[in-house]
Amino acid sequence: MKLLVLLVTLLVLSWTSAEDVGDQEILQQHNEDNNHKSELGEAAPQRTDNETSQLGQETPTIRVARAYEFSSKSNLEWVRWNGHIPSNAVKISNTYVGREDYVCRVGCEAGYYTPKKGPSCFYPYGFTEQHSKMFHILVNRDNFEILEWKWKTGGEVPENAVKACRDLYVAKNKYGLGKLHQSHHVFYLPWKGTEYKYNEYYVLNVNMDVVEQKITNVRYNMKGVEVHKDKPETLRSTSVKNYQCREATKQVTLEKSTETSQSWDVSNSITLGVSTEVSAGIPNIADVSVAVSAETSVEISHGTSKTESTSHSLSVSATIPPNSSCSITMEGCTFKANIPFTGRLTRKYSNGKVTSSSVKGIYKKVQVGEIQAVLHRCDKIADAKPC
């Protein structure tokens, strides 16, 4: 009889799954290091009604916390769940439970989605693990951004941390994905119906250490492009006087420098402080039609705009009547055009990694053209000696 009881006991023990063992480890870790009252001195703050109501609303385009606001041009975006995992969805290999978990968000609350648990995003909220079938998944289009997990403690946030919104950030620990609540100074983990908190965690971070960037394969779409031409304006003027009693012919030279500005504004973010090389043909818009030159390389030191100075020189032979003063001007028209284009943006990082992504953008140019000399009517010189 004792032998039979022993065998039954061994069978029961053998039925304990690895995940149950994992639950025990998490509970032990939670009890040792993550008691809400012992670490915070009181229960974790409750959400207000206003905050709770935001769970079902759209939240701002993803931003990266840094000295300046990360623009909506980032390849990172929150994509609404439509029943299928989007291409280039951000995921982790959760070795603790042996599955792939995807970064998701319900309202402002970051959590995880895994196909093994059905079409829901699981997230920590109000001391419990909650889930919703209405959620967004984080996507890194073309895997263009280099994403890294940076270890932090006590609510610390790295410079380029990925925000869910407000002071909530995408984070994880060895057990899985959750959220870093910066004002609470802790990381929250959803686990089997309960919300656990931890002082140590990893925050999802964007590597911004770009050393080179290039725009190549530029193709302009000339369909429907209109060139705007301003009225002629005076660039330079001079006057020529003839005090003689007969006509005089004089050679006049007019010189002036004008600025031509051009930019390739793309749908992706350009890393500031890093020069950009653009390999493309250059549209010439100072005419009725737009002509594109052969491909050349343009080095841009800041952003995607470049301004160049062009010198103009005109020589005019003017016949001046006796005792007269004639005005001669250099005139030109300002041309402006916006031309859609497609291309490819490539980045090189200090660690040697290279990423690239397709881009759409607008080529903008302001150029002065149709420069000519104009001889205006001559006037008699009032104080000239009579002939």
UniProtKB/Swiss-Prot annotation:
Keywords: Disulfide bond, Hydrolase, Secreted, Signal, Toxin. InterPro entries: DM9_repeat. SUPFAM superfamilies: Aerolisin/ETX pore-forming domain. It comes from the Eukaryota. One of its GO terms (molecular function) is hydrolase activity. Expressed by the venom gland. Residues 31-57 are annotated as: Disordered. This is Natterin-4.
